C-alpha cells in the first residue's frame, strides 16, 4: 500500500506584499496557489532579521532560510554571533585573537588585518575591524596594518570613502592603525580561481609591485576618475604606510563568509599553493573569523556550531523515508543547508538533482527547470514509498534577481502550473503539503520609480497547510515549519528543536 507523503514545498523568493507595483507575486496569474490559499488554512511568517538569527532589519536569504527551516529553531548566523560576542565582551577574551596578538608582541612584529570594509553584513562588517583595533590597543600592539577590500556590491557602488573616513577617525581616536593597501573585492575576493586577479591584491598587500598613492582616499578617488566603482578598484599601496607581510607577523582576516575569503587565504596559509609563484612568509600566525576551507592552515576565531536534530535527522531516527529535490541553483539549500551544514545523506534519504538551464541570465528562460523538477517528483511519488518530501522551486528568486517584471511574472506562472500537478497528486495519495517560501524577492522587482530592484525583501512569507479542519497561529517564523511538518507526520518534536508547530492545538 502506498504511503501518505507529507511535503514541504518552498517557493524560493516569494513573499506577501500589499502593493501591486513591481509585485510579480500579485500580478502573476496563479490559479493553483489561489485555489489552495482559499480552500485551506493559511498564515504568514517572518523570514528576516532577528526571526532567522540575523541582525534586526536584515533581509533573509536562501542559505539562512533553509538552515532555519531545517533546524526548526532560530539559527544564529555568524554576523549575529560575532556582534553578540563584541557586545558581551567575550570577543576580547577570545583565545585565538589573543594568541595572534601574543605572537606579534613576542616577535616585536606587525599585526595585519584583512577584510571587506563595509557594513553590507553579507561577508563582513567593518565594526568588527574596529573591535580588533580596540583589542590591539588594549594589548599594546604598536604596528597595525589594515588591508582594506572595497565592496560596492552589497552596499552602494561608490560608498568606500565613507568607510575609509570612519576607519581613519577610529585610527586617530585609538592612536594605532593605518591603511597599508586597498583592493577592490573583484581582485582580493575572487572565488573562481582567477589567480591573476588575486595576484594583484597579493602584491599590494606584500608591498611588492603595485600603484602607490599618498592616502587611501587619494587612491580611491583616482579610480573613480577612471570610471571604476569600489568593487573594481585596482589594488594599490598607501605610500610609507605599508611594510608588507613579513616573517613573524600575524594576520587576522575578519570576513565571516568563507567563499570569497578562501583564495587569498590559501596564498598565505596553504604550503601547497600553486596558483602563482609566491614567497612563503615564515612563522606567520594566520587567523580567520570562520573556517574557510580544509586547505588553509589557520586558527579559527569562531568555530562552527553543530546543529543536531534537524528535520532530516529526526526523519531518520523515526525510520521515515525522505526525498530532497531541486534544480542545481537550489540543490545545496534542500540538502546541505536544510541538514544544518551536513553533506551526507541520512538513512532513508534520497535526492534528485535536476540541472538548471545553461543560459546567461534566467530572465531568458523564466521557467528554468521547473517542469523537469515536477516530472521527476511525480515519478518519485508514483513509487509510493515516501514519507517526507522537501522540494524547492528556484524560479521566483533566481528570475526575481534580474529586476525584470515580465520574466518574473512568467517564472511564477510556470511554478504555479507545476505546483498544481504536484499538490493534487499528494492530495490524491491522502498526503499533506505545506506551501511556503524562504524569503522575499519576486514580491518587489521594481523600485517605486520603476528601477530594477534585484535584492531580497524583508516581507513575511505565506504558509498554506493543506489539511482541513485545523487552525493556524497568526504569526510565526521559518523555524516553526519543521515542527509543523512533525505535527503532520505525528512524530514527537525533540527538545533542541525549539520552534513551535503553526497548527493550534
Curated annotation (Swiss-Prot):
UniProt EC number: 5.4.2.12
Q: In which pathway does it act?
A: Carbohydrate degradation; glycolysis; pyruvate from D-glyceraldehyde 3-phosphate: step 3/5
Subunit composition and interactions: Monomer.
Keyword Manganese set for record: yes
Which Gene3D superfamilies does the record cross-reference, listed alphabetically?
Alkaline Phosphatase, subunit A (3.40.720.10), BPG-independent phosphoglycerate mutase, domain B (3.40.1450.10)
Q: How is the cofactor bound?
A: Binds 2 manganese ions per subunit.
> Mind telling me which PANTHER family this protein's record contains?
2,3-BISPHOSPHOGLYCERATE-INDEPENDENT PHOSPHOGLYCERATE MUTASE
Q: What is the lineage of its organism?
A: Bacteria, Bacillati, Bacillota, Bacilli, Bacillales
Task: Kindly provide the name given to this protein in its UniProt entry.
Answer: 2,3-bisphosphoglycerate-independent phosphoglycerate mutase
The catalysed reaction is: (2R)-2-phosphoglycerate = (2R)-3-phosphoglycerate
Provide this UniProt record's keywords sorted from A to Z: Glycolysis, Isomerase, Manganese, Metal-binding
